[in-house]
Amino acid sequence: MSDLKKAAQKAIELMDLTTLNDDDTDQKVIELCHKAKTPAGNTAAICIYPRFIPIARKTLNEMGCEEIKIATVTNFPHGNDDIAIAVLETRAAVAYGADEVDVVFPYRALMEGNETVGYELVKACKEACGDDVLLKVIIESGVLQDPALIRKASELSIDAGADFIKTSTGKVEVNATLEAAEIMMTVIAEKNPKVGFKPAGGVRDAAAAEEFLGVAERLLGKGWATPRTFRFGASSLLNNLLHTLELAEAPKGPQGY
């Protein structure tokens, strides 16, 4: 198997197959669940809005794919600085049955010089998740832009108990970049290599996935990237990976997140 095919295979195993669109329906989520069971193996998780968790759980159970995790989003997509609301949303997501919660860090507050609210929000949301539900913190690196701010958001999130740090919501112009990945995984290497990293949005094909995995290997070592420490947040990427593995036709038309 070529290096590119190996990267494609690994990226599928590390994928949070995502639909976070305003026009999502039960039917679209059911279809997403079926896509997550690919000819090359299952994706690590699906990522959906909280209201769809029950139908997703039912569908995955019926498929015999209970091992596919269900991730959802809170404080999404704007990263407001109201801790109480973020915690209520996170508690509700856990009550719905989420295995993982992707919460948006209050990145605009950080840009205005407030470091405290981000730390406190992540800490409170991790408490709401408990030990059994993973908390991934979206820092919106494409809006932060400044390397010092990307570093600070990563540090605050890890200090507050994040299980993962994630680049992006996929709802802004600039999503996952290799530059942000470098900074974020450097912080992970310095602070706690058990914390995971999730590039989301903008990873379009196997070659791009291979580049992100290359950064992980260089900074954190061969074998570090497993579903417990690395995820790709993506929707259109899956078809490209299956095409690379010669298991699907080439994708047609404009590609999403």
Curated annotation (Swiss-Prot):
Q: Which keywords describe this protein according to UniProt? A: Cytoplasm, Lyase, Schiff base
Superkingdom field: Bacteria
- Molecular function terms, GO-annotated: deoxyribose-phosphate aldolase activity
Q: Which GO terms describe its biological process?
A: 2-deoxyribose 1-phosphate catabolic process; carbohydrate catabolic process; deoxyribonucleotide catabolic process
**Keyword Heme (UniProt):** no
Where is this protein found?
Cytoplasm
Instruction: Provide the top EC class.
Output: lyase
A Pfam family annotated for this UniProt entry: DeoC
**One CC-aspect GO term:** cytoplasm
Q: In which pathway does it act?
A: Carbohydrate degradation; 2-deoxy-D-ribose 1-phosphate degradation; D-glyceraldehyde 3-phosphate and acetaldehyde from 2-deoxy-alpha-D-ribose 1-phosphate: step 2/2
Q: Which InterPro entries match?
A: Aldolase_TIM (IPR013785), DeoC (IPR011343), DeoC/FbaB/LacD_aldolase (IPR002915), DeoC_typeII (IPR023649)
Which reaction is the catalytic activity of this chain? 2-deoxy-D-ribose 5-phosphate = D-glyceraldehyde 3-phosphate + acetaldehyde
Q: Which residues form the active site?
A: D102, K166, K198
Enzyme Commission number(s) = 4.1.2.4
This protein's record includes keyword Cytoplasm: yes
**Recorded family membership:** Belongs to the DeoC/FbaB aldolase family. DeoC type 2 subfamily.
Q: What does this protein do?
A: Catalyzes a reversible aldol reaction between acetaldehyde and D-glyceraldehyde 3-phosphate to generate 2-deoxy-D-ribose 5-phosphate.
Protein name, entry field:
Deoxyribose-phosphate aldolase
Organism classification = Bacteria, Pseudomonadati, Pseudomonadota, Gammaproteobacteria, Alteromonadales
Gene coding for it: deoC
